Amino acid sequence: KLLEQLGFVGYDGIIHWVIRKDCDCEEAVAVRESERKRLERQERRSQEEKLLRAGVARRYLNATVSRPESVRFIESFDVGVGAGLYYIGGVGAGKTSEASAVAKSFVWAGYSVVFATSLAMLDAIRASYDGKGGAGIDKFASADLLVLDDLGKENANSWALTTLFQVLNGRYENLLPTIFTSQYTIDALGRRMSRNGERESAQAIVSRIAQVSEVVNLGSADRRRGRQT
């Protein structure tokens, strides 16, 4: 199909012809559509890579926010306030999915986000002490948003609780928000962390969590199995 053309005289005195509008012939439309899809795939991969680098698991890349408390947290977020969320629920209640969905919003908004289980965080910090290239305390203590998944699964020894306190106290003092997920209420978490006699550290940790966290109870329904646990 012939295209409308526009001519102009350049400084060289020669008439230059340019296409006035995109060709709407079938072949050109197909090329443009193919390019649009390619750019969409490229952007999707880029967004996925950002989430994976932040620690969001591939299984939860498509997680969506389902709770009004999560929506409020996202919409009213102020990095200098330090308020966070504490998702509690049984196995399979959707804690990790909900926390991942919230984390996604902040990754895409350009905030530094670190998502890790408490076990993985402690392993990474220990590896940094052993010279194995793991992430040190500062990575977790200084991120704009930290998501600690499955809190209460970690060992309750002196090193683990002292390290956990260092991370959380650093965030507490610098008004940096933390999102927690756990099978335990905050009081039950304190008792669990005290099980090996580290009562003082346990109390210091749960006191800070209680002060800055809105508790969101996701119930006990196991979504993975479709039955009550």
What are these regions (language model features)?
Residues 80-81, 109, 140-143, 171-175:
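Short loop/turn elements that form and flank the Walker-type P-loop nucleotide-binding site
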Residues 82-100:
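Walker A/P-loop nucleotide-binding motif
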Residues 67-82:
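A short, well-structured juxtamembrane/interface segment
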Residues 1-70, 226-229:
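A short, basic N-terminal segment
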Residues 71-74, 88, 103-145, 155-162:
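Short glycine-rich substrate-engagement loop in P-loop NTPases that contacts/grips substrate
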